């Protein structure tokens, strides 16, 4: 959404809002909320769900702002990110940092006051893992950046889970592993059709360092691994026929696109796989939620 034509203060507020990567935060919050509902045999208490959702969203937005701040020099060299306010100079480094710290601090305070210390500490760890470890240390230095750094992005359902019951169970770890395994092929698909952008910016993404063929093969292999990991909720007895049917269809489609991409590469196919992977995760977690309340046993 363009902010052109708005008063200057609203344009500035819009620029700050965009630095928080609202679309990414929306998916993070969605997975966290699903984790909250899965952690409860009934409907979780709204007095926990509302502040937990807001707290996680605020910290996620703050982490995204720090990411944009740290990468402003890189963003200038990439067509995909050159418009960001930190790259154009519309929002200064000091202001970005202060707003991020204020927003993140409010989120953590909310989690500590209305949820529990475990969730607050895990959320802080996730912030540090993404904004500092991934952004500063991993992304500019290793093609395995997304494999190692993906742990931070896989935390939302665990944060939602602990917000409700204050502990980490096997099912919560299974949710973590699903997103952790999903993350590399999701981002590698993006990096494939944006490889020139990443090369121009000097970022060692897998398609830049190892080439297209190696990357598409890696996507296929991770696709098969993801298929196995998504069966964990069934193996743990936490999901039934609804989820199993959904996950077989979703994994089948993902593998079909991955294999096709490997056999006859085209940027358009990589784009399609990237877009599908977002819907894949959304529908998979929606199926988990539906199955949770309308469980159809497999035996």
From Swiss-Prot:
Enzyme Commission number, as recorded: 2.5.1.141
InterPro entries: Protohaem_IX_farnesylTrfase, UbiA_prenyltransferase, UbiA_sf
Subcellular location: Cell inner membrane
Enzymatic class: transferase
Catalytic activity: heme b + (2E,6E)-farnesyl diphosphate + H2O = Fe(II)-heme o + diphosphate
Pathway this chain belongs to: Porphyrin-containing compound metabolism; heme O biosynthesis; heme O from protoheme: step 1/1
CDD domains: PT_UbiA_Cox10 (cd13957)
Transmembrane segments: 24-44, 46-66, 97-117, 118-138, 146-166, 170-190, 217-237, 239-259, 278-298
Membrane topology field: Multi-pass membrane protein
An MF annotation (GO) of this entry: protoheme IX farnesyltransferase activity
Top-level taxon of the source organism: Bacteria
Single GO biological process annotation from the record: heme O biosynthetic process
PANTHER family xrefs: 4-HYDROXYBENZOATE SOLANESYLTRANSFERASE, PROTOHEME IX FARNESYLTRANSFERASE, MITOCHONDRIAL
NCBIfam families for this protein: cyoE_ctaB, PRK04375.1-2
HAMAP family referenced in this protein's UniProt entry, alphabetically: CyoE_CtaB
Other known facts: Carbon 2 of the heme B porphyrin ring is defined according to the Fischer nomenclature.
Protein name per its UniProtKB record: Protoheme IX farnesyltransferase 1
Gene for this chain: ctaB1
